[in-house]
Amino acid sequence: MIKLESLQDPSPRKRRTKLLGRGPSSGHGKTSCRGHKGDGSRSGYKRRFGYEGGGVPLYRRVPTRGFSHARFDKCVEEITTQRLNALFSEGEEITLEALKQKKAIDKRAIRVKVIVKGDLEKTFIWKDANVVLSQGVRNLIGVA
């Protein structure tokens, strides 16, 4: 039978702390619940996350999935007409190298596409095959 005075708070904050190394009758004496020898018995020991006691850990047992295209992806950038107006002067030739020099695109870029945002206020020379014009830009400059 449960009596009122025998009820205990089950939460860990009310539990009495384990006194370690206080003699054999305490139940936590001698090795202080650490066992004999091994990493866990040493001071300062913290088990590494994912450590499985020397066995092959899960992250090495599970096969790698899929394939990454990161090494083979072609870097294609885009640039707006508004940005071209700000970067280049009237009659200047727009090439991939010129855009890289002005740091308008990534240095790894192999191609750049010009898209419409605002009007083209200046006339530019378009000769580079790696600078592709969108249909909207073609309509702006009058090239079919």
Swiss-Prot record:
Coiled coil: none
GO MF, one annotated term: rRNA binding
Keywords: Ribonucleoprotein, Ribosomal protein, RNA-binding, rRNA-binding
Cleaved signal peptide residues: none
Region (Disordered): 1-48
InterPro entries (UniProt xref): Ribosomal_uL15 (IPR030878), Ribosomal_uL15/eL18_sf (IPR036227), Ribosomal_uL15_bac-type (IPR005749)
GO annotation, cellular component aspect: cytosolic large ribosomal subunit
GO biological processes: translation
Annotated family: Belongs to the universal ribosomal protein uL15 family.
NCBIfam families: rplO_bact
Oligomer status and interactors: Part of the 50S ribosomal subunit.
PANTHER family, sorted: 50S RIBOSOMAL PROTEIN L15 (PTHR12934), LARGE RIBOSOMAL SUBUNIT PROTEIN UL15M (PTHR12934:SF11)
Protein name listed in UniProt: Large ribosomal subunit protein uL15
Source organism per UniProt: Chlamydia abortus (strain DSM 27085 / S26/3) (Chlamydophila abortus)
